Amino acid sequence: MFGRDPWGGPLEISNADSATDDDRSRDLDRGALMRQLDETQQSWLLAGPGDQAGKKKKKYVDLGCMVLDRKIFMWTVGTILGVGLFIGFVMMIVKLVPHKRPPPPPPDQYTQALHKALMFFNAQRSGPLPKHNGVSWRGNSCMKDGLSDSTVRKSLVGGFYDAGDAIKFNYPMAWSMTMLSWSVIEYKAKYEAIGELDHVKELIKWGTDYLLKTFNSSADTIDRIVAQVGVGDTSKGGAQPNDHYCWMRPEDIDYPRPVTECHSCSDLASEMAAALAAASIVFKDSKTYSDKLVRGAKALYKFGRLQRGRYSPNGSDQAIFYNSTSYWDEFVWGGAWMYFATGNNTYLSVATAPGMAKHAGAYWLDSPNYGVFTWDDKLPGAQVLLSRLRLFLSPGYPYEEILRTFHNQTDNVMCSYLPMYNSFNFTKGGMIQLNHGRPQPLQYVVNAAFLASLYSDYLDAADTPGWYCGPTFYTTEVLRKFARSQLDYVLGKNPLKMSYVVGFGNKYPKRAHHRGASIPHNGVKYGCKGGFKWRETKKPNPNILIGALVAGPDRHDGFKDVRTNYNYTEPTLAANAGLVAALISLTNIHVKSGIDKNTIFSAVPPMFPTPPPPPSAWKP
């Protein structure tokens, strides 16, 4: 069939054009194309080894979603495996081969001093010493204490010697154990971080084990307590050897050591109760021992409340060396610790009774000694301790009023430590004169530093940035600055550039008033009077009394390194306990700083305030 296209082309229907149209249509049909591809793939699979299809199989790898050149595929897989093996090998080398880490920063001066301060307690141990005691010039001593006394006739071996002599005074010894325990309860993580936790706990147990021997600790009710072992009074004349009449190493003592008991001694009993109660919290994970301490503490506090009186009657050895001025502060102090150890509200009621606070001197704000924390006056420590209770538990009625009073009084005490208020004088070198210029000032200085540092940590833990002194607000850093300034003075930042901790720094006292340190450990026994030649010599002590805090400078920052003048050079157990507590509170380590908020409350039940009494009936 023919025709003419109006545009000049033929109108003939061509079969060739029809075929081309079919091809175009097939190109648009992808399903048909895929069917052809499937047939091709089947031919590859069915082809023999000599066929061209077999050659293609060797050259390509079909992954389903794509077809890859076999060489490229194998190279890629090999590379990935090689890189993986190399990385694994490197990681294994890094883990297995020891590599050097940057050394930790050197400990600060407070940590260094703390290690030494604890060693002083090792040097003061009485009785059979452990092999790891670490003081080469000390040995077993006074192994018959109590057994040779015709009245007591029981073992009083152990405990700590008080100072440069060999007397064991329970009153300052118990306070020292309370202070060490308090510092562990608040700063356990710090002790652990510097490797001293086991050491300080061992020292506390050494003290509390001895205190448990000094009364009938297995009874619920007692009628007497041992107050001290040994005698120091030489004022009565005569040639009766005792711990002050003689100058001997404790290991060589052969003179009688009398035991002094008391039958009405509320101050001593309550302080010993505080020591055992605080230690029971330290050892709460050792339930048997902790329970033993609590039982003893209950008996002691009960005895103190029932048998009223001071442990240091006029003219006694106790009154000469560690006179107690009152027992009311011990009732508050001991009651607070008994409450924390037992959770029994009866003890808290005693500690917070308004009459108790009044008798303890809580309202004697004009007293020159208000706020001076010592082995004799525990009120400032009790106020801080009970302020802690209010800050973190807020027990409410009926305790809130007196707790708020204690809290406000603690704020006032902290204000009194600041130089701008002139509550206490300061030496030109910067030492606060809490004992008003009298001798042996450092024991009071370190106690104040501890309370200030601890209270600042309490405020921080309670998210309280500071406190008010009248209309003026001060941050907690002001308290820490005060505490650091006092410890820095003790450690050498003073006009004499003298460290008052033996063995710390380049310049420290070489002639501590101490029998054991001053007499050579050379196998020679020097008798009662034979040792005095070592007391009088101007040579340095042959044995270094590591960590001992000496009595300190005078009010003009002057110091005499003279063995015979105990007002400058004698260390004491109580002073070193305050030093340890202050140092650990300011130690700067790379662990969680601040206090342990909760451990002290581990025995305290949840607080459900007692509702106030109903109002009286209305009458028209």
UniProtKB/Swiss-Prot annotation:
Location of the region described as Disordered in the Swiss-Prot/TrEMBL record: 1-26
GO terms for MF: cellulase activity
Catalytic residue list: 165 (nucleophile), 513, 561, 570
Cross-referenced InterPro entries: 6-hairpin_glycosidase_sf, 6hp_glycosidase-like_sf, Glyco_hydro_9, Glyco_hydro_9_Asp/Glu_AS, Glyco_hydro_9_His_AS
Pfam families in UniProt: Glyco_hydro_9 (PF00759)
Main location: membrane
Catalytic activity: Endohydrolysis of (1->4)-beta-D-glucosidic linkages in cellulose, lichenin and cereal beta-D-glucans
Principal EC category: hydrolase
Protein name, UniProt field: Endoglucanase 10
Source species: Oryza sativa subsp. japonica (Rice)
